[in-house]
């Protein structure tokens, strides 16, 4: 009988830091959306009350008591250079809670730094057709995030591939 096909065999040479990526074979990749936004981050989304807390809010609201805010857990903000305060959210220690904006280049740079620090080779930069077609604010947001990701991927030598969710 034919030999069974082997999956997940490490028959590849691991990537060497400082060398360009010539294949994705054997790399540890993640998906990266970069879809969070906040008032004051400079994105056109923040000019509109219903999209100011982009992707944090549910039904145009991001506030305590809303049953379905669209984050699963609060981010650890201790390493973020720029932080945004969404109103009345209070941490257990009594401090006002803060969040990040993916539109802010320093956020994307930090995420790519973490990828390098923790051995993640790179990302599939996920872009959503519905967010960029006939949507100038969405296109501006995601083009800025992509530009920041390209800069960060070069600085931290992480692989990057653009993929579209159709």
Can you name each region flagged by the protein language model?
Residues 1-166:
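Glycan-processing catalytic domains of CAZymes
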């Amino acid at each position: 009988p034919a030999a069974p096909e082997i999956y997940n065999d490490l028959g590849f040479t691991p990537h060497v830091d400082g060398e360009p990526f010539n294949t994705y074979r054997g790399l540890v990749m993640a998906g990266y959306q970069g879809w969070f936004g906040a008032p004051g981050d400079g994105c056109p989304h923040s000019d509109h009350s219903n999209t100011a807390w982009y992707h944090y809010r549910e039904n145009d609201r991001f506030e305590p008591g809303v049953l379905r805010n669209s984050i699963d857990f609060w981010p650890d903000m201790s390493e973020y250079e720029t932080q945004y305060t969404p109103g009345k959210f209070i941490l257990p220690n009594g401090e006002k809670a803060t969040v990040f904006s993916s539109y802010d280049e320093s956020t994307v740079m930090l995420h790519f730094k973490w990828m390098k620090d923790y051995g993640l080779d790179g990302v599939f930069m996920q872009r959503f057709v519905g967010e960029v077609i006939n949507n100038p604010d969405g296109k501006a947001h995601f083009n800025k995030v992509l530009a920041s990701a390209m800069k960060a991927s070069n600085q931290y030598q992480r692989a990057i591939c653009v993929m579209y969710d159709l």
